[in-house]
């Protein structure tokens, strides 16, 4: 719009809520010199524009959703969330304000705060979401469980009793989705419906309503085309309703009169005019074509004229304009046009000159509906001439976004004046000169020059504030895009190397350390970045430690612990070490094996969410239409490594103790002073009486063995242990992951004695044997690995660790195509049958243990141990 200019004056500052806009809708009304304002909280402010003073503040029980002023009755109607409609008499404002000032002379605020009495609630209803008031009637819209309900009441006055008696009629509208929340206080709807009243041209005009208060008069042609013959003949006002689902419907007011027990039929009373497919934010009317008297210069300024165009705006900017136009056949038809304006729309207003003002989070714009494609022709009857513009071009007014707008009367200079509540909580007036074609230089007085400079400085500060906000938002988004690009590169680098050397790798090593007077098994995870990328914000190293169940608890399950360590600025060539204790616990127990898994996690919510979140909390409600679209897992998970820590890795050796002067200490809780004293007082040469010592002295050690083909071992160990005796090489291979393996490497050993985490001995012996009766070609050379320990649990853990290594070796050799020698199948079948018989005996003995007494169970347990020993020493060989 060429030549549009504005002058902004700041009147006062108010506090705006940080919550959603639909939960408390800001509202601004003006009548004469008084401005009635709500910021969406529980306060209604009364501001004297001429005096520049805040005269009173009304405090309601909950958030204020809507205001409407009935000036001819000197009454202000207020919709309070989850409470109902209140009616305040403006005549008592001065008296209430004076009394409040006398009672609170020493109060901090310079204005009186008037707590609204509950008796002022003239229509209590927690489901009310919108209303409009006429001279003698009150129309409400309530949200039911499944549908909207429109109700018509006799208009209540201030000081009257609540109105269950005054209902005249009701009708149900379309379906709705009720908000959530607890039953006592349900959540507020995100968008509130919009109600307004349309009067026919020959009816009693709404003189008691200020402009922009939801009541207007349409020309006869448009009124009849929209609402039908019945509304025209009845000369009935029509209630227009814009719903959050996008429906624009109407109800003829005089047809709504029904009995209290028989609501009206929606199919007859409710007419759907259009569907915007987005929440309706504003409904208004304007003059799109000049009136004949106005064109001739006979219409006086301020004289009442009827509107010829109905306008509705949706939240995302979809705009509907309806006007009566001539068809090609010469008949009057309703012309409907949809436009797309910048969104999301926060609020809107229109004047009688064909201008629509709408506010977005970044700007306040105006569009002109009088710019038609065809020129105005005064020879057409009824003033229904011409058409609507095909395209609307919004013009920026260079004003920050507004939460509420009100078009006041035209200023004496001929410019339009807007009253607005900015997103920062400032009440401002905007004098708009929308018809000036070009600025005309003129001499300026000194006083006017100072005022002009002040206005320019305010505009510069306003624009600077907007630029700062936009720059901060752009910087955050650029940072997020850079981080996402790095994350994509890291993900591709890791996923393209599923095996082998990775550009970003994590290694796990274990070692024994002295911690709090106890020997602790520590795991060190080293994250090394060998790539050309950096791990910055959003990256987390996750380490999961999964312990196995106790060997003595058959029904027990292991426990899992996950540690998360933020990775902060791990650049190329850098490494990060994390050390975690694995055990033993305070009771001295270390349940092996322990499985450790490491992975990198990239949090999309931390990086992208911070970029999409508004920098200014006051802007938060207006970005709700762009929700954070993230996957359900909220991030990217990249596995790095997995390692199992078993008994062979946890064995300690006397020659490799951390402190050479002492042998490894038995882990467990620190000895109590009394126990220490008794041990020191024990006579020299006396035997210890602990459970472990007694078990080692009187019970034979538990043993298990496994035989592996010598050829299979030579093929698997020829590269890493060539030049060593096969038994020594096998022992080195079994203990290769032990931190104290240097003890084995220092000399050629075929057997070694280690110390388990609980302090008991574990002996490993490797020797060569010849297995006969298995192959028709002759004896098979094999290596027998024997485990011996006084602790049955530790023997089982070591045996399990050996089997796990041999299984991996056999799988790798099978993939290379190695084939076993010929075997005697009858001999193998006999061994298999013997094992099946032993397993059946084990099951029978275990069932027998459940029913025997303590004395008999000892004998059964001995039989079980004997059978377990036979099972752990099979006659088979792994080939």
UniProtKB/Swiss-Prot annotation:
It is found in: Nucleus. GO terms for cellular component: chromatin; cytosol; Fanconi anaemia nuclear complex; nucleoplasm. Keywords: DNA damage, DNA repair, DNA-binding, Nucleus. GO terms for molecular function: DNA binding. InterPro entries: Faap100 (IPR029251). GO terms for biological process: interstrand cross-link repair. Its main location: nucleus. Coiled coil: none annotated. Plays a role in Fanconi anemia-associated DNA damage response network. Regulates FANCD2 monoubiquitination and the stability of the FA core complex. Induces chromosomal instability as well as hypersensitivity to DNA cross-linking agents, when repressed. Belongs to the multisubunit FA complex composed of FANCA, FANCB, FANCC, FANCE, FANCF, FANCG, FANCL/PHF9, FANCM, FAAP24 and FAAP100. Forms a subcomplex with FANCB and FANCL. This is Fanconi anemia core complex-associated protein 100. It comes from Mus musculus. The gene is Faap100.
